[in-house]
């Protein structure tokens, strides 16, 4: 008999809670995503996360300890060697990744682009981090006139290739992206995904078409999600979860436009009758505020998210479990624009916890979540991770 019929896992993308013991190896000494935001805001107002026990993990400005937290609380340390979204999420579901995905804040190495030019017969322009719309404004006309490929990246581990559909036919663009995917399987160039970014229109009025295609990497092994799906449990992926695992172990995928849309979809799944896992990623914290080093916007987004939690609490049933965590840090007052190597919070709550919660031992790997989910549903345990299911008392 499953202890919990439904587990709702929420990943607050990039919401770290202080430098990890190995932060120095990543250039991240002193990073502290929530702590620095709380200082910048002169106190974060997150009363619902505080009730669950956020301030019991660590007190921060505006976030204090409570006498009787509703949930169990601790922090988790990442075991894998990367600090990107895919590594964090794959570890959460029981994998250990010893090859970090590469990011290219200065653009891609010349050797890689030379090889891509040689294999595709087309010249490459761009080669820098940029927003898709900005790079089209800047280089779209040149691309049309020369037939070159616009190659660009972002703060994430991606290689994107943009071309006008009337200049480089879709079939050719997709073939080019497959070549780029092959080349970036090399460890030193390993990106999480290659993305075809076709566009149409005239200079000054370019638009990206829906013919985007992603060439992702499948997880390097089976995850707890695969085990759940193969045992006929539901795995409802909300936000970019399905993309992160390249659809592996997903039974239903719900796209989201924003954090608030993500919370709406979470409430929708709370209203659904299912047995298994609902897995939500809230990406705005990372994409809109962390990489852009905007502590004010980040703080406001955290407060908006917190204000939605009562709707979630209200709909949770006695045999539901809510797990809230993060996948890495992205301290908006830290130097650079990259993720930061931090501990992440872990909060666990069910309405059946009548006595309230208490501190759990520090988790040595994010995979403890996957192990807990696996044990609850009686599926094969991941190779990594220690379940804390039996420590959650009703």
Curated annotation (Swiss-Prot):
Family: Belongs to the phosphopentomutase family.
Organism: Bacillus cereus (strain Q1)
Binding site for Mn(2+) 1: 13, 327-328
Subcellular location: Cytoplasm
Reactions mediated catalytically: 2-deoxy-alpha-D-ribose 1-phosphate = 2-deoxy-D-ribose 5-phosphate; alpha-D-ribose 1-phosphate = D-ribose 5-phosphate
Function in brief: Isomerase that catalyzes the conversion of deoxy-ribose 1-phosphate (dRib-1-P) and ribose 1-phosphate (Rib-1-P) to deoxy-ribose 5-phosphate (dRib-5-P) and ribose 5-phosphate (Rib-5-P), respectively.
Main location as per UniProt: cytoplasm
Recorded GO MF terms: magnesium ion binding; manganese ion binding; phosphopentomutase activity
Top-rank EC class of the record's enzyme: isomerase
Alphabetical UniProt keywords: Cytoplasm, Isomerase, Manganese, Metal-binding
Protein name: Phosphopentomutase
S-S bridge residues: none
One record GO biological process: 2-deoxyribose 1-phosphate catabolic process
